[in-house]
């Protein structure tokens, strides 16, 4: 469409020029204005389209879009809370959650050394929590667990404190804050139990109200297969396991506060019950070779005593 300004110029020029000549010049000028204006518009629209496309496909916009999508995924997976879901893992997927062979070996070594030191010093202990679940369900360490748990009675605590230097002789570090923690490459938690009415409970009972034993569940202690070694545990573990880990014999829950090798588990994975498969039931491996550290240290101490005398 001819702009109003062009029309007015056209009429003005006709009025101020002579006859047909003026009309012809003005008409030519008007056509020129029309085509110039139309061409300018088309070119402008064309350049505008290219400009919009370039802006849309700019590196900055692409990165921004990727970040928005990434933030959305993180919010969904790690911030939002989810309902429980049930999943069957393939054998390959199970491997993603397993602890490393090095961690497994250090845990079995730590359990062996602890068992031998406590037994040698007549301190009764029992495996507990995830370690008990591992012994019952996997006959070893749960494949995605990375610490150990045992319990001893309050009456044995002073005696236990007296043998702590023997753990240090084996190269272990000792921490104590409500519970005792024996650490090498991995750690073992020792809970001190006492009797409260008809239950045996530990100092963190308020935090873990389902972790207790009735006397007929705990005693007499019995041995459990744990990889290639044997350890002591409660006489009847089922009641304790049912209280702490409902449906433990059907499903595995990967998440635990100690799973440091799984720091980036999403909230979705934390609220997933994995259906137990033969692969998921396999304990953490390898079982060995394990060193005979306690006997070696004992032999060295005896030799030093003889040499001293």
UniProtKB/Swiss-Prot annotation:
The membrane topology noted for this protein in its Swiss-Prot or TrEMBL record is: Single-pass membrane protein
User: Which keywords belong to this entry?
Assistant: Membrane, Transferase, Transmembrane, Transmembrane helix
Say if the entry is tagged with keyword Hydrolase: no
- What is the native source organism of this protein? Rickettsia typhi (strain ATCC VR-144 / Wilmington)
Q: TM segments? A: 62-82
> Which Gene Ontology BP annotations are present?
glycoprotein metabolic process
Q: Which residues form the RPE1 insert domain?
A: 9-55
Q: Which family does it belong to?
A: Belongs to the LicD transferase family.
Q: Where in the cell is it found?
A: Membrane
A molecular function (GO) held by this record is: transferase activity
Q: Per the annotation, which location comes first and is thus the protein's main one?
A: membrane
The reply to whether Transmembrane helix figures as a keyword in the UniProt entry is yes
Q: What is this protein called?
A: Uncharacterized protein RT0683
Q: Name one Pfam family in it.
A: LicD
Q: Which GO terms describe its cellular component?
A: membrane
